[in-house]
Amino acid sequence: MGRGEGAGVYYLDDEPTAMSRQIATAANQIESGVSREQLLDILPAGGARNAVDCALWDLEAQHAERSVWNLIGVEEGPVDTAMTVGLEADPTAMAEKAAAASEFRIIKVKLDGDRPVERIRAIREARPDARLIVDVNQGWDFGQLQRFAPTLRDLGVVFIEQPLPRGQDAELAGYTSPLPLCADESCLDSHELAWVEGRYQMINIKLDKCGGLTSALALAAGARRRGLGLMVGNMLCTSLGIAPALIIGLLADFADLDGPLLLTHDHPQGMRYEGGRVFPSQRRFWGAG
C-alpha cells in the first residue's frame, strides 16, 4: 500500500470534498496501474494529485526495495528549516515569538502593508542572529515594494516572498530589486517558469501547489536551468506531507517545512525537529522501500 497526503491549496479551491471527488473520479484509472507520468494527465495540479503521486512514489519504493531517496539519487538527511512568525497587530508580540524560536536560524515573517518596517525592526532587535525571510502573501502594490524593500535590505532580510498579487506583478519586469524576490502564488508549476524569469529571482515549490513530488522535481530542475533560486514550502500538513517535501529541501537553497509544528497532533513518530533542523523520521513511514 502506498501512502500520501494532500493538504490542498486554498487559491486552487482545494477543499477536502473537491479533492476527494477528483480522486474518486480517477479511481478506476489509478487502480488499473497508472504511472506517475500518466497521472499528470489524469489529475490537475493540486492537493489531490499530490496525495496520489506521493503514494505512487511510496509504492514504487516498496516494489523496488529501495528508498525514494535512492530512486531519485539524493542522499537522505536533515535540512535547516524556517520557523514562521505569523502576522499580529502588535510588532512586539511578533518579536517575542521570534525570540522564543531561538533554535531556528531562519525566521519567516508574515507581513502586509501595515508597519512592515516596524515589525521587522522589532524582530531584528530580538533576533540579531537570525536570517529573516519576509512573506507578504500578495499584500503589497508595486509602490509599497519600492518603498519598503531598501529598508528591509538594510535590516538584513534575505529575500521577499510574493510581494504583489498574482496577475498584478507584470511591473516587476525590468525592476531592479534591492532584495531577491521569490514567486509563490505566481509560480504554480513548470509551465510558468518562462513568465517568472526576469521578474523573480527565486521560486517557492510546494507539493500541494504543483501536484506532487514528480512535478516538484521537474519544477526544481527547470528553475535551476534558468538560474533561479529554490525554496521549498508546505501547506499545513502532517509529517506524511513533509517527508516527500524534505527531498526537495535537500535540493533547495531554503526550506520552510514547519507545518507539523503548528498542529496539535502529528503523524505518529513523525519528522524530528531539533536545533532548527528537520530530520527524516526514524520510523520510516513513507518512502523507505
Model-predicted segments: where are they?
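Flexible, glycine/charged-enriched surface loops at secondary-structure junctions
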Residues: R36, V68-L71, F159-P163, N234-M235
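N-terminal capping/lid subdomain adjacent to the active-site entrance of alpha/beta enzymes
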Residues: M1-L132, G139-Q146, P150-D154, Q269-G289
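Catalytic alpha/beta core domains of metabolic enzymes, predominantly
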Residues: G167-D258
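Flexible C-terminal active-site loop/helix
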Residues: G233-G289
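Active-site-adjacent beta->alpha loops and helix N-cap segments on the catalytic face
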Residues: D90-P91, D112-P128, W140-L145, L164-T176, ...
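Short phosphate-binding/catalytic loops that engage adenosine nucleotides
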Residues: P128, V157, L228
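Catalytic beta/alpha-barrel core
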Residues: T84-G86, R105-R115, R131-G139, L155-Q168, ...
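Conserved, mostly hydrophobic/aromatic
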Residues: V52, E65, I107, D135, ...
